[in-house]
Amino acid sequence: MAENTEGDLNSNLLHAPYHTGDPQLDTAIGQWLRWDKNPKTKEQIENLLRNGMNKELRDRLCCRMTFGTAGLRSAMGAGFCYINDLTVIQSTQGMYKYLERCFSDFKQRGFVVGYDTRGQVTSSCSSQRLAKLTAAVLLAKDVPVYLFSRYVPTPFVPYAVQKLKAVAGVMITASHNRKEDNGYKVYWETGAQITSPHDKEILKCIEECVEPWNGSWNDNLVDTSPLKRDPLQDICRRYMEDLKKICFYRELNSKTTLKFVHTSFHGVGHDYVQLAFKVFGFKPPIPVPEQKDPDPDFSTVKCPNPEEGESVLELSLRLAEKENARVVLATDPDADRLAAAELQENGCWKVFTGNELAALFGWWMFDCWKKNKSRNADVKNVYMLATTVSSKILKAIALKEGFHFEETLPGFKWIGSRIIDLLENGKEVLFAFEESIGFLCGTSVLDKDGVSAAVVVAEMASYLETMNITLKQQLVKVYEKYGYHISKTSYFLCYEPPTIKSIFERLRNFDSPKEYPKFCGTFAILHVRDVTTGYDSSQPNKKSVLPVSKNSQMITFTFQNGCVATLRTSGTEPKIKYYAEMCASPDQSDTALLEEELKKLIDALIENFLQPSKNGLIWRSV
């Protein structure tokens, strides 16, 4: 009898009109329960409804995801602002509608879908399942789909889009985010991530296609449709072949006595890094056994982000000591970023920052270009790029060596987009990076790539070893030649969007309305650039050269003492990040003095501009 009552209750819940007192919420509840065919996420909403948890229902159902610096990204679970079966179907329907409008040959060229190894039992949600549903929506509309038959590194998707001449592609991943998250990363036909206006237009199309179409839930199409193709072997072979373009010392690599440890952080990277090492002539790197295989719980690390440093590299470093390996390489879970560490003579580990690795990459890629360039190659056609919050070291190298350096807004989508423009104009791009350990060596992939970066660092270390030089020693040589660049990057957590907004609005109206600060503590400010509003005091017309980015907060201060500091919000996480760098000329070699000056300025920046105690900000814990 009790079972029948429960059944009746569920039946009534499913079909009754909802009277929460909020018409918008009532409509959203009805839509969710009609459209969602995933029993677990449907049950999550039903339970909230049954328990009268209207605030949480409103939070989950009365807003939608927007495109950040890496596409759509959110927690997995039930709701229109979460990543789940229904929202991925809706997103893909919007993609289909937009692509059909943009490409008359969409149904000839097709679409690429890849995925990482994330998953969540409570919502029956995994990257693989979401990839299958993405494919199903398109297959049901007679679009050829290149669906990878197993997990792949994120860079394989943009690479495949280019090589297969597809109109676009999607990678289901949340990269290095916490285990609860997942994402939907979109690449255009060029192989670069989408930028405006495509992101806004796709969102409009998603909002016009929220009700699942007939066939959108039919993931059996992945097994039965003749339009489904598996590009894995072909793309892996071609990717590894293209890696040879940035391998310059294969014979030397094959003879090196250096040993390398690699960790894939419970993600996709192991097999692909092993293959890349083989292409470069190396013996296989030693894998960290506890982290080699996919694990969506990331059970051996407190967070799956190698950027967090020594605290998350513990297993790798201990294994390297045991195996007498001097260099540790860590790819993040979707293998698009790379961290590196080197054992020093004093027995301590040097974990390189993204900016320090970029200094080494910049030196290496230009040095290899000089030694291997064709007779008529002109240095004036050579470019390197970085995001505006990253170190200015490439700018210093470019000024001395004669090549071009350019900055973009944060996010590799801007770098990829600019590289396309440069390549179309006959320019050569050697290297690009963002300080958050994202590196691009060569232009086979127009996105950051941890697999290629890992093997390039190995070759660099192997080459330097023949001259008895360590990576750390070479970094010092780079700074001695081009000028010391001492940087610090960190963040505060803030879960209250109104607080974040008020912090930045205060800076825009500091001493009086529409007046930015002229000092930070005792440090005089020369220039202010605010790309959120498009203001730049260093320009004659006071307008920022970088594109306006109204969807995120970002203000950069240039100080009289040569320091550049930026405050910005994260596009993927609830963080306020700060970036600060002292840029010195080569004759300023007192690093202790530079570091002390930088520390004082950062302390002033935090105390005067962020005010963590007053604003309830949570300090980064490492």
Curated annotation (Swiss-Prot):
Gene3D superfamilies: Alpha-D-Glucose-1,6-Bisphosphate, subunit A, domain 3. Mg(2+) binds at residues 175, 332, 334. It is an enzyme of class 2 (transferase). GO terms for biological process: glucose metabolic process. One of its GO terms (cellular component) is cytosol. It catalyses: (2R)-3-phospho-glyceroyl phosphate + alpha-D-glucose 1-phosphate = alpha-D-glucose 1,6-bisphosphate + (2R)-3-phosphoglycerate + H(+); alpha-D-glucose 6-phosphate + (2R)-3-phospho-glyceroyl phosphate = alpha-D-glucose 1,6-bisphosphate + (2R)-3-phosphoglycerate + H(+); (2R)-3-phospho-glyceroyl phosphate + alpha-D-ribose 1-phosphate = alpha-D-ribose 1,5-bisphosphate + (2R)-3-phosphoglycerate + H(+); 2-deoxy-alpha-D-ribose 1-phosphate + (2R)-3-phospho-glyceroyl phosphate = 2-deoxy-alpha-D-ribose 1,5-bisphosphate + (2R)-3-phosphoglycerate + H(+). One of its GO terms (molecular function) is metal ion binding. InterPro entries: A-D-PHexomutase_a/b/a-I, A-D-PHexomutase_a/b/a-I/II/III, A-D-PHexomutase_a/b/a-II, A-D-PHexomutase_a/b/a-III, A-D-PHexomutase_C_sf. PANTHER family: GLUCOSE 1,6-BISPHOSPHATE SYNTHASE, PHOSPHOMANNOMUTASE 45A. Glucose 1,6-bisphosphate synthase using 1,3-bisphosphoglycerate as a phosphate donor and a series of 1-phosphate sugars, including glucose 1-phosphate, mannose 1-phosphate, ribose 1-phosphate and deoxyribose 1-phosphate, as acceptors. In vitro, also exhibits very low phosphopentomutase and phosphoglucomutase activity which are most probably not physiologically relevant. This is Glucose 1,6-bisphosphate synthase. Keywords: Carbohydrate metabolism, Cytoplasm, Disease variant, Glucose metabolism, Intellectual disability, Isomerase, Magnesium, Metal-binding, Phosphoprotein, Transferase. Alpha-D-glucose 1,6-bisphosphate binds at residues 73, 175, 336-337, 434, 436, 448. Its EC number is 2.7.1.106. The modification Phosphoserine is found at residue 175. It comes from Homo sapiens (Human). It is found in: Cytoplasm, Cytosol. Belongs to the phosphohexose mutase family. CDD domains: PGM2. It is linked to Neurodevelopmental disorder with hypotonia, dysmorphic facies, and skin abnormalities: An autosomal recessive neurodevelopmental disorder characterized by severe developmental and speech delay, dysmorphic facial features, ear anomalies, high arched palate, strabismus, hypotonia, and keratosis pilaris. Early obesity and seizures may be present in affected individuals. The active site is at residue 175.
